[in-house]
């Protein structure tokens, strides 16, 4: 149990005809945040996402990296008890990927459970202390990171 911040599919919870500003409030509401809370965190969300000059542009004009940055910024504006991220570190430029990785590590250090989905074995080794290896929807192995990653690579 806990408040969950999911980032499962790029653009889910967004309206591509609305601006970035409007989508902060839409996506935040979907995640259960009040308008007042989002107003108090608005500047932080925009600053972390690094899309300030495009905040009043409709999302249909955003790159996939910009959408991912906005989604990640909204999802992590509070410390969720559970954060679900699907390939978030593979979208956007290298600087934002590193910034996102650091934010996830901070959240994990603060007690957030992160369910991290990735095909990048190096990211899995760096981010995880337990791993579930799934193949075609079936659990192949569950255990400590190095054991599972070694089996997967072997």
Sequence positions of predicted segments:
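ABC ATPase nucleotide-binding domain signature region
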Residues: 1-28
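Conserved ABC ATPase "signature" region
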Residues: 25, 37-54, 71-73
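A short, proline-enriched helix->beta-strand linker immediately N-terminal to the Walker B motif
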Residues: 76-85
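Helical segment within the ABC ATPase nucleotide-binding domain
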Residues: 97-110
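H-loop/switch region of ABC-family ATPase nucleotide-binding domains
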Residues: 118-119
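A short, surface-exposed alpha-helical micro-motif characterized by mixed small hydrophobic
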Residues: 124-126
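Conserved ABC ATPase "signature" C-loop
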Residues: 136-137, 152
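ABC ATPase "signature
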Residues: 142-143
């Amino acid at each position: 149990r806990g408040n969950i911040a999911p980032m499962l599919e790029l653009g889910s919870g967004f309206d591509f005809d609305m601006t970035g500003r409007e989508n902060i409030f839409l996506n935040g509401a979907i995640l259960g945040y009040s308008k007042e809370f989002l107003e108090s965190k608005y500047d932080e969300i925009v600053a972390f996402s690094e899309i300030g000059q495009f905040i009043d542009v409709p999302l249909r004009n955003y790159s996939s990296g910009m959408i991912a940055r906005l989604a990640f910024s909204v999802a992590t504006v509070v410390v969720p008890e559970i954060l679900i991220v699907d390939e978030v570190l593979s979208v956007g430029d290298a600087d934002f990927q590193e910034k996102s990785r650091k934010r996830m590590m901070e959240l994990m250090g603060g007690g957030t459970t992160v369910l991290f989905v990735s095909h990048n074995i190096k990211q899995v080794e760096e981010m995880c202390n337990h791993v579930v290896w799934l193949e075609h929807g079936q659990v192949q192995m569950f255990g400590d990171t190095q054991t599972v990653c070694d089996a997967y690579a072997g």
